[in-house]
Amino acid sequence: MTSFLPVNNTSSPQTRPMEEVATAATPRPHTNVSATEENRSRTMNSGTEDATPLNLHKVQEDSASRTKPSLGHNGTSHGESDADRDGSDHDSDAAGNAPPSKKKKGQRFYCTDFPPCNLSFTRSEHLARHIRKHTGERPFQCHCSRRFSRLDNLRQHAQTVHVNEEIPGDSLAATGTRFQRQIRTDRVRPQGRARAGTGGSQGTHSRGHSRNLSTSSIASTTSTYSQPPELRRRPPPLIMANDGSARTRLGLDTMADIPTTPPGQVRGIPGPAVAVGSPYTPSHRLFAAGGNGSPHLASARPAAAHMSGFWDGKTAARRLSVPTSANPFASQQPNNYPPSLVGSATPTTAAYPPGGVFASPVSSTHSFSREENAYSAADADLRRRTWHPSTHFALPRPATSGLSHYQTPDTVDAPVNASGATEQPPRLPGIESFDKVVLHQRPLTPPVRRPSPMQIDSHRKPSPSYALGGGFNYSQPANRPAPPISGPGHRRGHVSWDMSLHTNLTGLHIRDKPLPRDASHWSQQTIAELQNVSSRPSSSYQQQVQESRGITGHSAYEKMQGWYGGHTSGSQATRTSPEDSSSSEGVHTPSTASLEYHPAIVHNSGYIESHPPSMACDTSHSACPPLSQFSDGYQPHVKPDPRPDFYHNASVRDSGMGRLEALVAVATSENKNTAKLYG
């Protein structure tokens, strides 16, 4: 070291020999061997410099200052990131301890092999690295087969990517990272890594090397994993400082050994790291060895460590503190959880590792180290129970996980949701099923309508007067609900009724023509009904005509009878007509079906019911009471006054003509023409 001090203090010529020696150590051919030698020589130099620095800080500063001047110069002259990083590493080590101007001139190493590049470096090692960039050479290979042009990059890679993995002993990454780190942990820093360590202790530089250092590693999770021993020492205070003060204290006070998180991380690390003496190692051994039963512990643990940094314990502590209020639910939770979760939620000491991992990824993993440190197995169990329930109760997360039923605010809702989960699907399906019911049951509706028209007719006895008084009798709609007495038909009646109301209000043509909707929905029925109509067209149609006419001019009783007969066949006939004519018009079928159910309601006068049976009937019905009001739209309906005459005449004399006309009207769905024929 003393020899270095004079060199640092002396002018550049002496320093050159030093540098040249380093260069000799690493010839510029830049072979893989040379590269490794170069790095090793660098580390050796740094190691020699730093070996004493632990004890002699000034000496270290001096040695750093030796590099420092070059670094200062490097910072100004170096355009390359690598050189800058290296220089910055050393510069930061001795940040301005020595004036950079002294050694700049003598120590410069220039990149002359590649003409465009004229970068200068204070150390031959840096130049060698730089040249590897030009050549693209990557002599340092990781056991994962990735290659790097710089050893420090390889080490960083190993520290980050292979933190929790076993690195083969022959791997450069292993020698560069863990071996040296363990030595460093023991305060032995023979190699260049030690220099970075001293710099790290100074905290001046953030280089990759410094990251590797235990001191800087405190700030970096990656290094934390790689350096479990030191982390155990240092992290506790850091964790305390980082913890949300009282909140973490609640969970961590009993656990003065907050470093539990580092132990958790250490678990992920191979045995030697765990083996390093620490108050936590015993528990770790339990979980590492006894916990070996749960292979996922190690893997899961590292994952948790990555997620939470080395604050796993802290996170758990928070949850413990927060959930304490939820402890009363602890008993509920095990019951509430699915059996698998219950086991994990209330694990035995042996079950802790797996239980923690599965029950709540964050808290469970953290709880291990904590309880291991400060609690007996029984206490740990109790705390875990309260803690798990508390997390589920206090935190909304369980809701997503399906544990929401057990959350305090959700406990009431949870059962509702549970049943609701079953009920809700039925609700939606209920709506859909309702439509399905309408579709499927509509074929059944015509029979239901038959009695309903009777009732409506009975109610209609006064209705004609109402119709005379006002075109739209909504009192009849009130009567209309009676027809839907059939369960499904009832709601359908309402739906169809609403549809019919809209259609009636919007278009007068509805009376003139059966709504095309009827045809579409009743297409199937219509086919059968058409056949029925063809088989018995005369009787049904005449009855319908008589029915409509009877309503117009005859007593309510006759009208009811005519209705009944007419409606039964008429509805079929009507369907037939919509089917024939409105197959294209089928879109309107729903309303027509509703008309068939409650024609009176659909039509203001309430004749909609008569309307669906047959369009002719609708025509006549609309003509009957509402005729006065709807005479404009229903001129053909006005003729129903003579129709009452035809009622007898048509039934008696024109039965044959009525049959033909009814068939024609049904096929063409031309109600006006049919009405005119009878008129």
Swiss-Prot record:
It is found in: Nucleus. Residues 1-15, 29-49, 401-410, 531-549, 569-591 have a biased composition (Polar residues). GO terms for molecular function: DNA-binding transcription factor activity, RNA polymerase II-specific; RNA polymerase II cis-regulatory region sequence-specific DNA binding; zinc ion binding. One of its GO terms (biological process) is symbiont-mediated suppression of host inflammatory response. SUPFAM superfamilies: beta-beta-alpha zinc fingers. One of its GO terms (cellular component) is nucleus. PROSITE patterns: ZINC_FINGER_C2H2_2. It comes from the Eukaryota. The gene is dvrA. It comes from Aspergillus fumigatus (strain ATCC MYA-4609 / CBS 101355 / FGSC A1100 / Af293) (Neosartorya fumigata). Its main location: nucleus. Residues 214-229 have a biased composition (Low complexity). Residues 1-109, 168-244, 392-430, 443-466, 531-591 are annotated as: Disordered. Induction: Expression is regulated by the AcuK and AcuM transcription factors. The keyword Transcription regulation applies. This is C2H2 finger domain transcription factor dvrA. Disruption phenotype: Results in increased resistance to the chitin synthesis inhibitor nikkomycin Z and causes increased damage to pulmonary epithelial cells and vascular endothelial cells, as well as increased pulmonary epithelial cell cytokine gene expression. It holds the Pfam family zf-C2H2. A zinc finger (C2H2-type) spans 109-134, 140-162. Residues 79-93 have a biased composition (Basic and acidic residues). Keywords: Metal-binding, Nucleus, Repeat, Transcription, Transcription regulation, Virulence, Zinc, Zinc-finger. Transcription factor that seems to function as negative regulators of virulence by affecting the capacity to damage host cells and to stimulate a pro-inflammatory response.
